[in-house]
Amino acid sequence: MTIRYLTAGESHGPGLVAIAEGFPAGLAVDFDEVNRDLRRRQKGYGRGGRQKIEKDEAEFLAGLRGGVTLGAPIALVVWNKDHESWKDLVSPYARGGRPFTQVRPGHADLAGALKYALTDARDVLERASARSTAVTVALGSLAKQLLARFGVRVSSRVVAIGPRLRHVEEPPTDAERDAIEASDLHVEDEAVAAEWRALIDAEKARGGSIGGAFDVHATGLPIGLGSHVHPDRRLDARLAGALCGVQAIRAAEIGDGTQVGRSGPEFHDAIQHDPARGFHRPSNRAGGLEGGMTDGMPLRVRAYMKPIPTMLTPLATVDLATREATQARYERSDVCAVPAAAIVGEAVVAWELANAFLEKFGGDALVDVEKAVEAYAARIR
């Protein structure tokens, strides 16, 4: 049993829709929790004006009854409130407005228009927009709720705005998690947040943008999710691909993956065992993954986000229609969206973990999954 989904929708279209397949029957869904995650995605110092317009909520259309999954495909939609102001420009039934031809460096505009033989880059940018991550977060919230039934907890924190990385390895404590959730920059240290706000303000003043990095942690994972037998089944590859599939993410790191200058004894984690804890490690440099599989330690993955390429001070470009030099066209955008990207990162990591979990323990009903988990835990002790 695996889970999969498809989404559709444009940034300023009527809404964003998704169909998810493979969730076992019997999972009670907390709709308030789904909407809480959607609100978390909208937070963040440096966000643009659209977040004042949208009040994202997921509307479930199929696959549940009385708040409980049925084993059938789940359909949901997140409506775009801003569509009302754009309905004459972005509509399935009509085209309006002047074509978007001053393509923006760093976006999908040029490559997408040429690939699909389009003369108006709006036909590319509306789908390529990170607005689509709203429905991704709703799906990820379902995955997190499934994992939580088995003691798996997924969280995130921002570790950089601008060039300097914070060195934090352990998953956040409950107190740190509360501070992170209260922060407009998704970080537990207010002094650090103040430094980052100053960087964002400086970029806003010069008409630029700023990127950064975030970590996603997952605790409570059993040993053995994923596989070593084929590259496409390795969980580290799947997680890296999921993170790099998020708009503006340019790199992903597993554990201490970039610290390749260390010697072998300094890079790897020794293995220990005792009757109470089972197999465990005194360190977690691998970030919870070895050989494409979870090793029982907390998962730690990092994603690096580039500065958003839509800027008030535009870069030079070429007009798609005339092929003449011009300046990139500005669209309403964020100065910094790293905190929001961290919530999206949680969602895509949770989805891949839930998928791997159901590959290992899957059944058509949640009770079957629970029995499989119990039997496996007893066997590997």
Curated annotation (Swiss-Prot):
Binding locations of FMN: 127-129, 247-248, 291, 306-310, 332
Molecular function in Gene Ontology: chorismate synthase activity; FMN binding
Chain segments carrying region Disordered: 272-292
Gene3D superfamilies per UniProt: Chorismate synthase AroC
Domain of life: Bacteria
Pfam families assigned to the protein according to its UniProt record, in alphabetical order: Chorismate_synt (PF01264)
Keyword RNA-binding applies: no
Reactions accelerated catalytically: 5-O-(1-carboxyvinyl)-3-phosphoshikimate = chorismate + phosphate
Pathway where it operates: Metabolic intermediate biosynthesis; chorismate biosynthesis; chorismate from D-erythrose 4-phosphate and phosphoenolpyruvate: step 7/7
Record-listed NADP(+) binding positions: 41, 47
Key words of the record: Amino-acid biosynthesis, Aromatic amino acid biosynthesis, FAD, Flavoprotein, FMN, Lyase, NADP
Listed PROSITE patterns: CHORISMATE_SYNTHASE_2, CHORISMATE_SYNTHASE_3
Cofactor: FMNH2
InterPro entries, alphabetized: Chorismate_synth, Chorismate_synth_AroC_sf, Chorismate_synthase_CS
Family: Belongs to the chorismate synthase family.
Protein role: This reaction introduces a second double bond into the aromatic ring system.
Subunit comment: Homotetramer.
NCBIfam families, sorted: aroC (TIGR00033), PRK05382.1 (NF003793)
Protein name per Swiss-Prot or TrEMBL: Chorismate synthase
Source organism: Anaeromyxobacter sp. (strain Fw109-5)
